[in-house]
Amino acid sequence: MIYLDHSATTKVDPEVLEQMLPFLRDQFGNPSSVYRLAGQSRAAIDRAREQVAALINADPREIIFTGGGSEADNLAIKGYAWAHQDKGKHLITCAIEHHAVLHACERLQKMGFEVTTLGVDQHGMVDPQQVAEAIRDDTL
């Protein structure tokens, strides 16, 4: 089989799988609980968070693990909009964005935000001039 939808999901890298196997087989404790197995899981998550942070020169407190892309899209878009709505309530997106992005923007519209949705050309590209023209003083 030839799989061509790697934007939706991707095969787990063998090195990642090797690191995850102990947690999938034996060390599957709830990292938010209080028992010993849970503590081991929490420690592993904290180590992973520190490794990711070091890789991208971030503070570990800035690293949030999600269950997938749609959850991450919602967290990023809605979280940023809600946290910064005192600075503005205008967002810019693109008509061919992932549905999770578009749905997050639609939800924010229902909550009083304004959303400008830009189209694309025949090659799927957004015109940078359209982006510049869409930016307003209240754009987040």
Predicted regions and their residues:
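Pyridoxal 5′-phosphate
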Residues: 1-140
